[in-house]
Amino acid sequence: MTSPAALSPTPFGRVVTAMVTPFDDSGAVDLPLAGRLARHLVEQGSDGLVVSGTTGESPTLSWQEQLQLLQAVREAVGSDAQVLAGTGSNCTAEAVEATRQAAAAGADGALVVVPYYNKPPQDGLAAHFRAIAEAAPELPLMLYNIPGRTGCSMAPETVAQLMDCPNVVSFKAASGTTEEVTALRLACSSKLAIYSGDDGLTLPMISVGAVGVVSVASHVVGPQIRAMIDAYMQGDAAVALALHEQLQPVFKALFATTNPIPVKAALQLNGWSVGDPRPPLSPLPDDMRSTLAQTMAALRQT
């Protein structure tokens, strides 16, 4: 008889929200609103928050703004949630310094994206992440693979080379396939906690060994995502499947164009004045905003 597969730990909980960065009318980062939004997300079921990730518009934030955001969110949620700082860069020295600063500022972890644009080979990726891990050994790291944005994919075998770094504890899988989860588990065993990086694939990924999700949609449907994951983990696959299917229209609407354009519009529709994205991103077009509003209204009726 086959023994049950070992399940991975959950270093950052089950639902981690990749937070938007609020801007005021002048385009400056709205730190007080970031703190209020962070508290709201925790109250809606988030175990953890990522600041200054993809959804947080890290490419158009200065390092100083990113550090200020981290400090504001850390202060707002206290010990009620894990706070991860986006510290990735396509320059190893920059990523090392940002990760050190995040650790000193009280982050519970760092989300470190695969270097973008310069397309390093696999040995370069291994050296890059090892340097970051060794620079802040006290800070747990979540490696982040999103080849659709970076133009470079980190192979499971490369991740396995880093399993001797005690603080390489988790991986955000955003390649768009469940096969990545299986390949990572086979290469790294259950030691590595894998998080879905795609809201629509959360349930399929959990079914093959992921532990949770780094979510965009949890800004507006956090309780439902929490309920879906909890139902599956408690053995009620039918309830989890029903929630998965119920949420698909929202997931589709939130990714109808480049993230975080739609989710910022969704928050605005819910009364959160988070501002529009910074250029070169643009506001959500009126037709997409109308579709998004209709989708959210329909979900509230279910």
Curated annotation (Swiss-Prot):
Pathway: Amino-acid biosynthesis; L-lysine biosynthesis via DAP pathway; (S)-tetrahydrodipicolinate from L-aspartate: step 3/4. GO terms for cellular component: cytosol. The record marks T54, Y117 as: Part of a proton relay during catalysis. One of its GO terms (biological process) is lysine biosynthetic process via diaminopimelate. Pfam families: DHDPS (PF00701). Pyruvate binds at T55, V214. It catalyses: L-aspartate 4-semialdehyde + pyruvate = (2S,4S)-4-hydroxy-2,3,4,5-tetrahydrodipicolinate + H2O + H(+). PROSITE patterns: DHDPS_1, DHDPS_2. It comes from the Bacteria. Gene3D superfamilies: Aldolase class I. Belongs to the DapA family. Catalyzes the condensation of (S)-aspartate-beta-semialdehyde [(S)-ASA] and pyruvate to 4-hydroxy-tetrahydrodipicolinate (HTPA). This is 4-hydroxy-tetrahydrodipicolinate synthase. It comes from Parasynechococcus marenigrum (strain WH8102). The gene is dapA.
